[in-house]
Amino acid sequence: MRLVLSLGLGSALAIAVVAITPILSERTQWARALHAELEGLISPLSTKEITILALSSGLAEEMFFRGAMQPVLGLLFTSAVFGAVHVGPRKVLLAWTTWAFVMGLSFGSIFELTGVIWGPVLAHVWINQRNMTFIRRH
């Protein structure tokens, strides 16, 4: 039952984030700037490479941050560290750091609520794959 809840919440989160990404990119300066910055990194990647990157990063980050770190250090601190590792070399990427902190809180809340890592893993992989694909295509 907890697995089903975790996967359901992860799916709902992923659907919401993937749906809001194009809206934010169209309507907010910070999302447009972030999109433009990441486009140079993502546009050369093939669909296969994006999928491998999404799978490996989503699984590894969730296992480390939610699976290993959060039970010891708590939701807020783990989310702050998650955001901090998403710091880029340019100021425009500060929005990515903030977004990563919020996503860390979201992934971590699903884990806190259910005690199951697979919903956050599903959400993280899904969001990464769809949003990288969106950035590459637009």
Predicted segments, located by residue:
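Juxtamembrane helix-loop-helix connectors linking adjacent transmembrane helices
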Residues: M1-S57
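Transmembrane helix-loop-helix hairpins at the membrane interface
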Residues: W30, L41-H138
